[in-house]
């Protein structure tokens, strides 16, 4: 019986050949180098950043945001775009629904002059444009609004009433197979906004499902279920919505966490309101009756006054946000050696 080959030597030879053929680092041991912290794009709501477990939406990954109509899906995506741009990133918006409101986007903090926008005619065109932008390596965040509006060319060119079973699902499956690797290499975060449909004849469990087949469910690293739970009123006038987001899938941290925050009409996610809610929960802010206090200083009587105080004093708002993140350990925690080895920032 021949002698068994030296496994270590055989492995080193194989690794050397792989490095030569496919480039250095094609295969590596997981513990061999300090792992870079997960770069993230903040969502604009600290409660949602906390629920995600890493401080925001992960870079280089597929994100699905779905929910009923007018629940705040596009608002959440546009806040992520604004935060990416604020940190010097390039953003693109594939407006398949042809419903993007530039004025509203500007109010949320989006630099509409720099935002790349496409209003494609077909689903194939939309996903081809998205793929080319991702492969350029220049893009930081891409939003596709929405999956339901990615209509296959055959359906557009066909007659009303023609059956096109599975066309959109096949289109999404092929596109995600092509794009996922390129996203990871380029660090582009892709947010797919999706709509809800109801399955017919479901007796048990939820009849709700999302459009575009099952591929997006598998490829998404994070899936967010956005729901409007309450209408906010000032006097008798509706001024916004209380929104609940459930993290139904999360490959980066434990899933099934929930976040609640306010979306104000014309202003988007209330960052200050989210800071007040989280600050009280974490005992960083004190609520006594209707008064909110921070470090002995009164912020205001009632949430609206406290919100206005923080809006007028951004330094205090930033300090509260920093303390909340430190207390909850949001983002990657690095030791001294890792900091030297990996200079990449935690927040995008």
From Swiss-Prot:
Check the record and name the InterPro entries matching this protein: AAA+_ATPase, DNA_recomb/repair_RecA, DNA_recomb/repair_RecA_CS, P-loop_NTPase, RecA-like_C, RecA-like_N, RecA_ATP-bd, RecA_C_sf
Keyword hit for Mitochondrion: no
Q: Which Pfam families does its entry note?
A: RecA, RecA_C
**Entry's localization field:** Cytoplasm
What is its biological role?
Answer: Can catalyze the hydrolysis of ATP in the presence of single-stranded DNA, the ATP-dependent uptake of single-stranded DNA by duplex DNA, and the ATP-dependent hybridization of homologous single-stranded DNAs. It interacts with LexA causing its activation and leading to its autocatalytic cleavage.
Named from the GO MF annotations, one term is: ATP hydrolysis activity
| Gene Ontology cellular component annotations, sorted alphabetically | cytosol
Query: Its GO biological process terms?
Result: DNA recombination; DNA repair; SOS response
- Keywords carried by this UniProt record: ATP-binding, Cytoplasm, DNA damage, DNA recombination, DNA repair, DNA-binding, Nucleotide-binding, SOS response
Is Lipoprotein one of the keywords? no
Which residues of this UniProt protein bind ATP? Answer: 67-74
User: Could you identify this protein by its name?
Assistant: Protein RecA
Domain of life where this protein originates: Bacteria
The Swiss-Prot or TrEMBL record describes its family as follows:
Belongs to the RecA family.
